[in-house]
Amino acid sequence: KTYKEMKQTLTTYQELTGGTPDLAPVNDGFPLSDPTAILEDLQNRMQQDFPALADLTAQTVQCDIQDVDAGLEAYSSPAFYMIPPIDALMQNTIRINRSSTADGIELYTTLAHEGYPGHLYQTVYSSLVCDTQTLPIRKLFSYGGYVEGWAYYTERISYEYAAQVLAEAEGSLGSSYPAALLCTLLAQQRDLQINLFCLLDLSLHYYGAEESELLRSLESFGLSEEQSERVYDYLRTAPAVYLKYYVGYLEMNALKKRAELQWSDNFSLLRFHRFVLEAGPSDFENLTKRLKQTAAKTG
């Protein structure tokens, strides 16, 4: 499935760009650069398609955003959300690794993944539902495909928000492409990157590919020898990490398509997102069963 998706994405990307993408300066001049302002913008743009946290709590969600200490940059992810203690759900933390997260659209979509409507928003929303409507013991269970699939799913949506930001500012970041197409291409680039890492992960840990084969594949996609070795080392020591993101994302999209068919004219992104969030972290088999139990009428 991941291989089929990669071929389809690559074909679409080549058709849109003519094989010569003009994306080099995309991080120069994006209208938003302050992380707090970016989170505020994301919260405003998501209102139409995502249920409000205010529907569940009168408390204000706080988020402390700081850069990763320079001494830890080499050992940290590009950014990460720190799950709050169970008795301090409103006190949230996001850390940004400036050595591997560029300003501009990359920072914007990264904060969407980690913050709104990604990890922070999903964690707080699902936790509030769990505390009041289901069983709190569910918090002890971990479903990486759901959590990271949701975060990557919302990251992909944030490219549409970024296009809106650019259009409102009448900017294209120096690219010859209009804002909407530019952000579509950047999203597809991201898909290709994550999908490639998934395929290489399977090649290494399931099919037993040699290091030289993986390095050759990475270099064929334009990575330097040093970058390729770094990616290989990560895949070798952290098997199946990227699969949580991309396969989870594919499953989330498949679930949305099922909801569109089942709910027909009563489908909306708001309803679908509420369904996923209220179901809470789960495996996709049970999410599908739960979806089949919902009525076609507006819920």
List each model region and its residues.
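N-terminal maturation segment of proteins
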Residues: 1-299
